[in-house]
Amino acid sequence: MPDVKKFEAGTYDVIVVGAGHAGCEAALAAARMGQKTLLLTISLEMLAFMPCNPSLGGPAKGIVVREIDALGGEMGKNIDRTYIQMRMLNTGKGPAVRALRAQADKAAYHRSMKHVIENTPNLDLRQGLATEVLVENGQAVGIVAATGAMYRAKSVVLTAGTSSRGKIIIGELMYSSGPNNSLPSIKLSENLEQLGFKLRRFKTGTPPRVNGNTIDFDKTEEQPGDKTPNHFSFTTPDSVYLKDQLSCWMTYTNATTHQIIRDNLDRAPMFSGVIKGVGPRYCPSIEDKIVRFADKPRHQLFLEPEGRDTSEYYVGDFSTSMPEEIQLKMLHSVAGLEHAELMRAGYAIEYDVIEPWQLKATLETKVVDNLFTAGQMNGTSGYEEAAGQGIMAGINAALRAQGKGPFTLKRSDAYIGVMIDDLVTKGTNEPYRLLTSRAEYRLLLRHDNADLRLKPMGHELGLISDERYAEFLAKRQAIETELNRLNTTRLKPKDVNPWLEAHHYAPLKDGVLASDFLKRPEIDYQTMAQFLPDNPTLDHRVIEQVEIQIKYAGYIAKEEASVAKLKRLEGKKIPLRINYAAINGLATEARQKLVKIQPETIAQASRISGVNPADVAILSVYIEQGRISKVAQ
């Protein structure tokens, strides 16, 4: 077969390869920052596609969607336009773990995002298969497509997802493919290896889809959406609220299901040695669950509609790569699915990922300058994690094209910052999923305050309009004004005690500040406000902030003190060309890890596995005593 002739096809400031959730956010960020941007995708039909669960949000992940929105991204707005169910999770728990989750109409989500991208100034959308990164003098200068088209750029962002040398596995059947039977990206992986990148294989999977018309919902438990307005985007008004929401449904596996799986483990690629890639710890296949948790009599499953105009239902928590005939037997053993028609078989997919320790905190690679990577190819799982990386890579690619300095988020700024720091500092041996437990400062990184944390940064970057920023400033001022009022207004026992005694609470002996009264667990803002004169009319989001900031003031202060200590360590930069071999006293493992990771700050060095406090102290002393000139030679 003759070589495809190459030709010059255009010049851009930023090129983004891949139009999944990472690629869409990266391209939109770069274009909105005024950079001429190309978004290249294997298939226009796969743009912002949801090949697995048709939902967004949940613990930690839902907060990431809010953070993307606060920075000026699109994911939150797009799901608000296209959801079919919205629920706030963990409402009985504290604000640090509350999280919004939306069921998406996956076809509408794709169409809506495609419409936004097609109508964004500075942004060209094109179908094509990238095969090579053009590199000159160690810098990315463009990409080559399979057709021979060469696109030049000042910076390049790769978001290839699970297409990178993708291989789908269903029982004994294996074939080269991207997700949902899209084209795989094979040559790009080979090119990255030639450039010196270290790749590894990961695996993920998806459950079967069944025809909702053949489900007996009477045998399942209904999970309706919330009856009060909730939104991912801070710009979506409460008046835009879907009242006609679609329910999800819950059912369970049983002893028969488990026996079918056990009887056919010899045909399960997970256990026959066919699958080599490492799968996600927090989203195991159903056959893996049955083996690992053999004592469990049942596992819950969620039946989730894939959209308003389709009968397809996603069988959540039933991911499998079993042969199709076994999948049918498994499904038909489940209550409500006895006669379910299989519309799509579940499958596993293996794919290439870049070892993320080869990345900087900006998501620029250490191997090739001006080349950024984001999304699942960095070793993460999940649409939200991908989109969070995408907006950061797009911002930094645009800043690099403009000749400006980098933009990063610290662990105390955002869950996005936690994720990126985990990836570039620790790497990952399995598909990485964000969890609230990964964040040290989760009381500061809440669902409700993402705009207070990040919107000023988004405005400074040019991603938040002056109009939206003015609305934000008004909200922030209203919060500060009300906090000041409650911190300076006293309540008298004679006004409050009748209510307290009527509700069987201990009465007050002395006057108390309104803010201290609000700290009592039995008191909420509305209860307290009835004892105050001249209450202002406040938006419920302002009231929510006031109540959280007062009730959790002590805990918030403790976390802020920890953040201040961390910032001092983050301020201690490690020179780029430091020679760790010249530093006496470092443990061998610590020296090897420091050479491999190349941390940018003392704080980052302290988080590397294998680098102990003594090593950090030695490194700090060398830098502080000015011996860096010696060790950098």
Curated annotation (Swiss-Prot):
Subcellular location: Cytoplasm
One family name in Pfam for this protein: GIDA
GO cellular component: cytosol
Transmembrane feature ranges: none
Keyword tags: Cytoplasm, FAD, Flavoprotein, NAD, tRNA processing
GO molecular function: flavin adenine dinucleotide binding
Segments of this protein annotated with the region Disordered: 208-232
GO BP, sorted A to Z: tRNA methylation; tRNA wobble uridine modification
Biased composition (Basic and acidic residues): 216-229
Binding site for NAD(+): 279-293
NCBIfam families found in the cross-reference section: mnmG_gidA
Similarity-based family: Belongs to the MnmG family.
Subunit structure: Homodimer. Heterotetramer of two MnmE and two MnmG subunits.
Protein purpose: NAD-binding protein involved in the addition of a carboxymethylaminomethyl (cmnm) group at the wobble position (U34) of certain tRNAs, forming tRNA-cmnm(5)s(2)U34.
HAMAP family per UniProt: MnmG_GidA (MF_00129)
Protein name: tRNA uridine 5-carboxymethylaminomethyl modification enzyme MnmG
Native organism: Lacticaseibacillus paracasei (strain ATCC 334 / BCRC 17002 / CCUG 31169 / CIP 107868 / KCTC 3260 / NRRL B-441)
